[in-house]
């Protein structure tokens, strides 16, 4: 494997698009970045280039939603040809829309099908094929249910890496948002899974809010995936390389990161992109700092205006007190 899963940013629908990933990559060279989940149907039949990304994003993984082995193999092959570093199968998303398409968390109940999907993808690509799943679904939440799933998908499908969202999913009655918050976290179950499947690479996801917490999990597991916290307080990514990968590079200041976004933004604007689609990912950069609210407000109120450019960010940056060396 050419990249590490030691720390990754979770695939998050409507959030981890290519603009977001470019922004995150400015802060960390080592963190593995994931696309939003993209369905096989969108890639095979949709209009538009759903696989577009920037070369600077590497290492970057494509997360696929689907349950047809042949379609998944087709998409995995396209991803590998485009240079993605990993393909990940979504077996964790609980939304009704996803279930109706017969993919996501409901696939936990069909481990042989998941194994077939993984095997079909592995047959056509040399890059890692991984699975992101939950610890259970509905009332099927025993440890045995999880170990049966991992056994079948690893032995029959050849999957060597699993990211475990340490909550079960309720397939009805809870919204996707509630499914990320209401089912209790069970980290020890993921730790036990690593003990029982020591030959597999096991990463954890769910509720991780700091690099200190990530370090604690890394005492027991191979990797940690951070979701909402990395999006809402993205500056935590700025010290990942130093804290978790031993980098000697200086940690970038927030102002430097904003300024490093300017050339990218100008290039994207020239290609017809909309400023707000890029700046929305940057709103949390000054989280909990003096001037943070003014920074967010100025961007939110101005980025959507016709003809807006990097001057919106320059003006927003001026709202942060100059004496702060941030």
From Swiss-Prot:
Annotated binding of FMN, by residue: 11-13, 63, 132, 165, 205-207, 227-228
tRNA-binding in keyword set: yes
E.C. numbers: 1.3.1.-, 1.3.1.91
Record keywords, A-Z: Flavoprotein, FMN, NADP, Oxidoreductase, RNA-binding, tRNA processing, tRNA-binding
CDD domains in the cross-refs: DUS_like_FMN (cd02801)
Annotated site location: Interacts with tRNA: 90, 177, 180, 293, 296
Catalytic activity field: 5,6-dihydrouridine(20) in tRNA + NADP(+) = uridine(20) in tRNA + NADPH + H(+); 5,6-dihydrouridine(20) in tRNA + NAD(+) = uridine(20) in tRNA + NADH + H(+); 5,6-dihydrouridine(20a) in tRNA + NADP(+) = uridine(20a) in tRNA + NADPH + H(+); 5,6-dihydrouridine(20a) in tRNA + NAD(+) = uridine(20a) in tRNA + NADH + H(+)
Keyword tRNA-binding set for record: yes
Top EC group: oxidoreductase
Cofactor(s) named in the record: FMN
Top-level taxon in the UniProt lineage: Bacteria
GO molecular function per UniProt: flavin adenine dinucleotide binding; FMN binding; tRNA binding; tRNA-dihydrouridine20 synthase activity; tRNA-dihydrouridine20a synthase activity
Residues annotated as catalytic: 93
Family the entry assigns: Belongs to the Dus family. DusA subfamily.
Alphabetized HAMAP family for the sequence: DusA_subfam (MF_02041)
The protein's role, per its UniProt record: Catalyzes the synthesis of 5,6-dihydrouridine (D), a modified base found in the D-loop of most tRNAs, via the reduction of the C5-C6 double bond in target uridines. Specifically modifies U20 and U20a in tRNAs.
PANTHER family xref list: FMN-LINKED OXIDOREDUCTASES SUPERFAMILY PROTEIN
Descriptive protein name: tRNA-dihydrouridine(20/20a) synthase
Lineage: Bacteria, Pseudomonadati, Pseudomonadota, Gammaproteobacteria, Vibrionales
């Amino acid at each position: 494997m050419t990249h590490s899963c030691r720390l990754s940013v979770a695939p998050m629908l409507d959030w981890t698009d290519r603009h977001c990933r470019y922004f995150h990559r400015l802060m960390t060279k080592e963190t593995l970045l994931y696309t939003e989940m993209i369905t096989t149907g969108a890639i095979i039949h949709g209009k538009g280039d759903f696989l577009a990304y920037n070369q600077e994003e590497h290492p970057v993984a494509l997360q696929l939603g689907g349950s047809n082995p042949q379609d998944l193999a087709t998409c995995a092959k396209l991803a590998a040809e485009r240079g993605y570093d990993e393909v990940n199968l979504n077996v964790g998303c609980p939304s009704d829309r996803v279930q109706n398409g017969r993919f996501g968390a409901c696939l936990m109940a069909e481990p042989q099908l998941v194994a077939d999907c993984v095997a079909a993808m592995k047959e056509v690509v040399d890059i890692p094929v991984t699975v992101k799943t939950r610890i259970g679904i509905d009332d099927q939440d025993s440890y045995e249910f999880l170990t049966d799933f991992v056994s079948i998908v690893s032995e029959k499908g050849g999957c060597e890496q699993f990211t475990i969202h340490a909550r079960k999913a309720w397939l009805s009655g809870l919204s996707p948002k509630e499914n990320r918050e209401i089912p209790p976290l069970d980290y020890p179950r993921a730790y036990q899974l690593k003990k029982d499947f020591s030959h597999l690479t096991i990463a954890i996801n769910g509720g991780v809010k700091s690099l200190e917490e990530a370090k604690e999990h890394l005492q027991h597991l191979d990797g940690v995936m951070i979701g909402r916290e990395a999006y809402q307080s993205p500056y935590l990514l700025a010290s990942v390389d130093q804290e978790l990968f031993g980098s000697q590079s200086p940690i970038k200041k927030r102002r430097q990161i904003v300024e490093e976004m300017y050339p990218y933004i100008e290039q994207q604007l020239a290609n017809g992109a909309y400023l707000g689609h890029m700046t929305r990912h940057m709103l949390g950069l000054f989280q909990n700092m003096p001037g943070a609210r003014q920074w967010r407000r100025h961007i939110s109120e101005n980025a959507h205006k016709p003809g807006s450019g990097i001057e919106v960010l320059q003006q927003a940056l001026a709202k942060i007190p100059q004496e702060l060396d941030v």
